[in-house]
């Protein structure tokens, strides 16, 4: 019954977010009107069969140049659209740019278009802002009539820049843009999240007090370690047993999110489970560890079947547990599914993996460890309390504050989820955007297909 309830809750939340996003696009269009950075956003002032006025076409290799021109297009906003089409070669690559002058204000960048013969919008198209800072559009949704809408909001910097639309790697594809909009928008709100992680192994009687400290520190979310209740596979508890009840009660008492991992008995199966409780004390969902360490399997624990993302009031939360971290696919899949913060309860782990897992997938990571150093990392791989340690990291940090409370075995940090930096943020979103942004990949075909095939190959073959 509880599993069915969780599935229903997840479906309801997903539907609500879909409808809210859809409404937001329409509201944003009206709200941003009158603050345009450049005009002719719908190409109504351009002549058919020509490049649109004010835009410059670039093809680094003329032999691979796509076609860019304005065409008459019934059903578009103005009756016209900007067409980009392949030249018959799979290596086809080129872009069209419009100069803009920006300031230290917040901006909305929006496009609307239709495609034909385009397998993957992220692989075949990019929509970027290049200048003293770089950003772009990384999320799209389907709309009625076959239209696709993409939008992003970002904080600008003073200086000249360019809006760039790129067409790449689609031999016979076509795209018709009927809107390319850039304009000022209301200030982007910060999204501060205060995280508490525990450190060290403790007995069950330690945790009520620890959660009280987290509550008094007014954290948003508190994470305990893997096996925090001190029981092994041979002593599993139901989800509403002592460990689960403690988490629910303290979450409700302090109005915070609470998570931690323990061995859960469910029917005739045992899982290494990490439940997540809401500030109301409600069970939002349970993640069952998918990559079990050998002793767990030998002792009767079963692996989970799914990498999950949970919606909370502050953002999307994913979970990976201990040995999951040794496999980059776990964090990457969470990033692909929209996770912003990954909770990482563990008994022990390799510290050096965390900056890579965070930066590769563009996520924040909170690690609570029983036997290794606990920590909190932002999406650029910067560690709270140690943000300048890596000289090869070239960006700001989204970490707002940090405290290491050894007396209470607790680390807290506040991060701003509205600032998703990558390690080389100056390198441009199409070259160094967080890995969770699929558009970062510049391959002609997805390597995931090869990875999936090779991962399933158990027999030796000659190297190719």
Task: Label the predicted regions.
Residues 7-21:
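Bacterial N-terminal signal peptides
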Residues 41-47, 82, 86-123, 148-156, ...:
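Extra-cytoplasmic beta-strand recognition segments
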Residues 47-81:
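Extracellular glycan-recognition surfaces and repeat-rich motifs
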Residues 133-160:
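Extracellular carbohydrate recognition and processing domains
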Residues 165-172:
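Short beta-strand-plus-loop segments that form exposed binding edges in beta-rich domains
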Residues 175-187:
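Exposed low-complexity, polar/acidic, P/S/T/G-rich flexible segments that act as propeptides
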Residues 216, 221, 236-259, 325-419, ...:
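CN hydrolase (nitrilase-like) catalytic-core segments centered on the catalytic cysteine
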Residues 266-337, 352-356, 360, 389-399, ...:
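Active-site catalytic loop in hydrolytic enzyme cores
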